[in-house]
């Protein structure tokens, strides 16, 4: 998928991962309880960023021809979601609600719409207007979910009305 959309999705997934790393670092400095969870999500978003370019999830279809990768993806999302309920419960309600909405939008596109379009693939109808419209809906949902997540995370890192956090990166020889 060599397109602007793929490039943009890769960048925002990477940005989400970097922001989770920053939040993990801030939690560590402040003796927060969620350092590990933020680090887990940082790694996860970086993997999703790589997957967006490389298409690792599509490789799963070649390994398990009888089952769509979305089946395995749904199981993984369910496990991760359940395992992170305590983490979500510790977040402020606004952040938690925005994260859940963002996740639902992203997963709805990545797994829901993708699963719904499997029919087009099975019936060799991937070069149709209908399939391409569904693909646009899928990509829009994924991008919107990540942008909302980034918004919520930035708002969580620097709450409205508080002094901004200054992060400085220096490169030395």
Model segments located where?
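Hydrophobic alpha-helical segments at protein termini of multi-pass membrane proteins
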Residues: 1-173
